[in-house]
Design a protein with these regions (language model features):
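Vicinal oxygen chelate
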Residues: 2-25, 109-170, 213-217, 223, ...
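N-terminal beta-strand motif that seeds the catalytic metal site of vicinal oxygen chelate
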Residues: 2-45, 93-100, 147-188, 244-247
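A broadly used, surface-exposed interaction patch
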Residues: 77-82, 87-100
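Core segments of cupin and vicinal oxygen chelate
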Residues: 20-29, 35-76, 107-114, 120, ...
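Short, solvent-exposed interaction modules
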Residues: 90-97, 108-110, 239-245, 257-259
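Accessory, usually C-terminal, subdomains that scaffold auxiliary metal cofactors
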Residues: 206, 231-238, 243-250, 264
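A structural feature that tracks compact, well-ordered secondary-structure segments
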Residues: 80-82, 99, 103, 111, ...
């Protein structure tokens, strides 16, 4: 394991958060779900259910796409399946963005506008940012909670004990998600200017030729990863550009999780950290997920 270098920011997190809020940064309360552009409904849902154990918990049909919410290891994902994939074909399936709860949608709109961040979709009760000024991420904002308010699910969300003890992957929840960017300093400047964050650690990862900064954003840890030379991060950026690279789950037993995937014909690969294994996009309907023992 590569030693982590503390930024020294954590002890002053509350004070720094107050200062950030005063200068117009967005205070996110809770992550709601991670958004994925999927190529097809039946095959993606079958894979997510059979291999990852996903629950199909909400259906949102529409004229442009079929959207659904699925629950995997304590994390909600929204899958958007376009009626026709032609206009998405060159880019392929990918992580579109991530939704956070905020207290005031109107104030958040104003904060984004003041930073020259436009909206690509606004349905009133929620909205998505333009990806280009947001490091390739369409951030979505919502002023309610899927987790702490009543909601009419197709079936009840399975509790943490089920994912930890009853499912063979042994999920312990979301560990972090990673964002790959070509320019590390510019990426950190964006997050510092846009959101209330608490920087936790910095480290170099020579085995992936990557530079990493980890920070707390609401109830999630985000890892910003940039290339330091030729390697998997550089290749990822050449193919997909800036944006969400991977979602990392904690698991009770990494060997047991690997055995589960092997039973489905999937061999896990080395992840972006020395203690993670990954299911690669080619084996996971176009998106990378990682697993780390906790």
């Amino acid at each position: 394991m590569v030693p982590q270098r503390s930024t020294g920011a954590a002890p002053a997190a509350e004070q720094e958060g107050a200062v950030a809020a005063k200068r117009g940064c967005i205070q996110c309360l809770e992550m709601q779900h991670i958004n994925i552009a999927a190529r097809d409904f039946e095959r993606t849902m079958a894979h997510f259910a059979d291999v990852l154990g996903a629950q199909y918990v909400y259906d949102i049909p529409g004229p442009q796409w079929h959207a659904v919410l699925v629950y995997i290891g304590g994390v909600l994902f929204e899958l958007f399946v376009p009626e026709h994939f032609l206009l998405n074909g060159r880019y392929g399936p990918h992580y579109v963005g991530i939704e956070y709860q905020v207290r005031d949608l109107g104030a958040t709109r104003h904060q984004l506008a003041a930073s020259s961040v436009g909206l690509i979709r606004d349905i009133g009760m929620a909205f998505h940012t333009e990806p280009e000024p947001c490091l390739g991420i369409a951030f979505e904002f919502y002023d309610h909670s899927f987790h702490n308010e009543p909601f009419e699910w197709k079936e009840p969300l399975k509790p943490a004990d089920y994912w930890r003890h009853d499912h063979p992957i042994g999920y312990t929840g979301l560990k972090h998600y990673s964002v790959a960017v070509a320019d590390h300093d510019a990426g950190m400047a964006f997050f510092r200017h846009t959101f209330v964050i608490d920087e936790i650690y910095e480290e170099d990862r020579p085995f992936i030729a990557g530079r990493v900064t980890g920070f707390q954003l609401a109830d999630t840890v985000v890892e910003l990863i940039s290339p330091t030379g030729a390697g998997v991060i550089d290749r990822h950026l050449r193919r997909w550009g800036d944006g969400i690279r991977s979602v990392v789950f904690g698991v009770q037993d990494l060997d047991a999780a690997a055995a589960h995937f092997a039973g489905h014909g999937v061999e896990l690969a080395p992840g972006d950290h020395t203690d993670t294994l990954a299911i690669m996009p080619a084996d996971n309907r176009g998106v990378m997920m990682e697993f780390a023992a906790e």
